Amino acid sequence: MGTRSSPEEGTPPPLVPECDVEVQPQGHPEESREQEASEVLAEPSSRGGAEQQAEEEEVGEGSSTESSRDAPEATPPIAMAATPPASTSSREGVRGAARRLQGQQLEALTRVALMEQRVKELQRQRKELRIEMEVEVALLRGELAGERVAARREEEQLRELLEQQAASEQRGRQQREQEQRRLSQERDRLEGLRQRLRKAQGQLDSQPEDQRERLLQGVQEMREQLDVAQRAYEDLEFQQLERESRQEEEDRDSPGPQVPDPKVQELQASMAQHRRGALQHRIRVLEEQLKSLGEQMAAESRGLSRKKEEALQALSQERSRLLELNCLQGTPGGDFSEPNPALTKLLFTQKTDRQLLVLQDAVAHSAATPTSSCLFSVHSSLQGSIGLQRTGSLPRKRGERGSQRGSPRPLSFHCTESLEASALPPAVGDSGRYPLYQLLNCGRGNSCGAIHPDIAHMERLLQQAMAERERLLKAREGTRRGTEGSSGPAVPAITAPPTPPHPPGPRILDLRQHLEGWGHNPENCPHVQVSGCCCRGPLVKMGGRIKTWRKRWFCFDRQARRLAYYADKEETKLKGVIYFQAIEEVYYDHLRCAFKSPNPRLTFCVKTYERLFYMVAPSPEAMRIWMDVIVTAADENHAP
């Protein structure tokens, strides 16, 4: 990385603007060690020459452990000249202290990760407990409401039964009283006629002969009236007896007597009272269970909240200790002398659902120049990729190829100023590819909030920044060589690794000839339109949130490096885009995982960082063509 300055030289190398932080994929921690050269150049002159030599030797050791992907670009370190024993012992002491600090940092990182996992587990348990308790409470409340409704129904039936009984008794009593009054009236009338007849017969003997005939006629009329009244009384009495007998017969024959037997009615009332008491007892039991369940839920919630608070306090303490260790090992600004991707993730990024918040150390805010935090949004497909690069293999043709990503996934940066060369972190030894994640350096005058959704524009800016960075590295190398030549170098120079080339574009490939070479015949497949760089055709796709199957028109474009799908064949209503960089796997749905697939035998899957797409082809040949087309695009993008 250029010549090394001797410890005796007091002139620091020229400063070059660089990014504050760089987050590298966790799967390749060796790549971050190559940035030591540029970080050493940016350090203040207060650091001694022995520390610079120690860090440069650590850079050499990090470069010798590069992965197989970066092996062609990494240059083996050249043996350094012999140094005095004092410098050697000082360098070994610094190296040992750095190792101890790094070990403590890794231990603290492990504890922090475990505590974060504990906090998440407590949150999950609390959520599950709340859901379970809510379900139990809802069930108990529903059962209690049902029991109360049944109790009210029983009470209403009992009240109606008692009212019917009272009304029936009242009607029977009134009817009997009315019949008794009629019988009494007829009996009194009959008795009056009898008394008149006896009185007339008594007067008949004492009357003279001339009046006796007239009295005999009156007595005869009275006897006739008495006979009529006697017959009427007997008829009325007979009708009453007949009505009573008929009522008794109806009561015996009918299943529901209008006037039930008092014993039966008493039995029914007692049964209703018993059922009512049982329902009330059940209601009391359910109310007690509901109350105890609420108390239990509150107690468990308080316990989980207390455990969560304890875990959060421990997590805060471990993070503070980790920041202190970082300040002991790194610079006052919080940079690491040996960047660790996992530590970088922990200290500088806090992953939310769809955002990465760049955090800054409070010590850096008080000691160094205050800078504003920069926020950039990352699509949810990037979840879990900071510090842990996801790898995948395409089962059809990606067998033994490397799992490194060739180009970055789409990012949406929020910064008002344009991207400068100093705002991008160095990416030496990255084989000419862009870093997977890059944190922008928002200075004091920068403000966050403007959105640049144009991905192609962002890629062009990244290429310009890479070129500017390479130019600055060359200028730095020339300055170092000039300084070494003027001071008479006593040690051999270290040759810089070759400049990484620009990301190569897609190789020239005729898609139609490629498919024909694989044994396909696009001419005989009317459902697919294949040209040299495009492939179009209808597919049935399952929705992401709402699992419904809809027919879409897919357009595979190698020049735009994307697979777009539209609502119409004229390609005017764009519904979604799948970029080549996001494709991980393409495979046949042999497990029949698609939800209610219209044709499971023609269903295949396209796995991306964001989601899993289920698609149904119109024919088997169309399915094979589409799978080979998408696999070819993913192979080109992920080729090592």
Curated annotation (Swiss-Prot):
Pro residues: bias regions: 495-504
InterPro entries: PH-like_dom_sf, PH-like_domain, PH_domain, PHLDB1/2/3_PH
Residue ranges of every copy of the PH domain listed in the record: 532-635
An MF annotation (GO) of this entry: enzyme binding
Basic and acidic residues bias spans: 170-189
Entry coiled-coil feature ranges: 104-327, 454-481
Region listing for Disordered, in residue ranges: 1-100, 162-189, 241-262, 387-412, 476-504
Keywords: Coiled coil
Record has Amino-acid biosynthesis as a keyword: no
UniProt domain comment: The PH domain mediates the binding to phosphoinositides.
Protein name per its UniProtKB record: Pleckstrin homology-like domain family B member 3
